[in-house]
């Protein structure tokens, strides 16, 4: 965005979804009093908020971006109201928030599956990001192991789909590597 001074090929939704995800896990970490969750998700939320500000700055449709950000803030405020005012005790609050965050995380990990069908049809991985795939695999694995260490299913379970989808994408990078399955050898001049 900064290099091109444009947001023309970049979607806002992933930034908003990741920010909401970080803020949800930050709340869960605060309820659990888990320093690791608090620190990691505070940094994640700050970075995602910065990305959103940069997106807003370079966007030509500032009103549309602002409405989406306000929609996210309204959703977060409603969630905060539900979890603080309508949920009777801290254990129930923690369980509900853990379930919400887990569901949201799973949805984020399985959402790129639509791209996988496109990759298989086109026999090309051009629409996938290799660095993002590796990073997702490492982050999902780390959070799964951390959840296992804490015996916290809310942390462990939603990260397993991240591992699975990353392994599938890594296999696709191998399977549809450039130059693989060509019936001829290119001539070099």
Locations of the language-model features?
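Alpha-helical membrane-protein topology signature
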Residues: 1-189
């Amino acid at each position: 965005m900064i290099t091109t001074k444009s947001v023309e090929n970049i979607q806002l939704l992933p930034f908003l979804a990741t920010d909401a995800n970080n803020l949800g896990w930050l709340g869960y970490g605060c309820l659990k009093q888990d320093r690791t969750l608090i620190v990691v998700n505070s940094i994640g939320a700050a970075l995602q908020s910065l990305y959103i500000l940069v997106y807003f700055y370079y966007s030509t449709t500032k009103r549309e971006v602002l409405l989406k950000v306000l929609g996210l803030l309204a959703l977060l405020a409603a969630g905060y109201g539900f979890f603080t005012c309508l949920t009777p005790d801290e254990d129930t609050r923690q369980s509900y928030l853990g379930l919400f965050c887990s569901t949201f995380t799973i949805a984020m990990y399985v959402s790129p599956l639509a791209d996988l069908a496109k990759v298989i049809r086109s026999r090309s991985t051009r629409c996938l990001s290799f660095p993002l795939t590796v990073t997702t695999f490492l982050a999902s694995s780390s959070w799964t192991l951390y959840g296992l260490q804490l015996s916290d299913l809310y942390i462990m379970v939603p990260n397993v789909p991240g591992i699975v989808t990353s392994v599938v994408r890594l296999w696709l990078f191998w399977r549809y590597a450039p130059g693989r399955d060509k019936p001829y050898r290119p001539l070099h001049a």
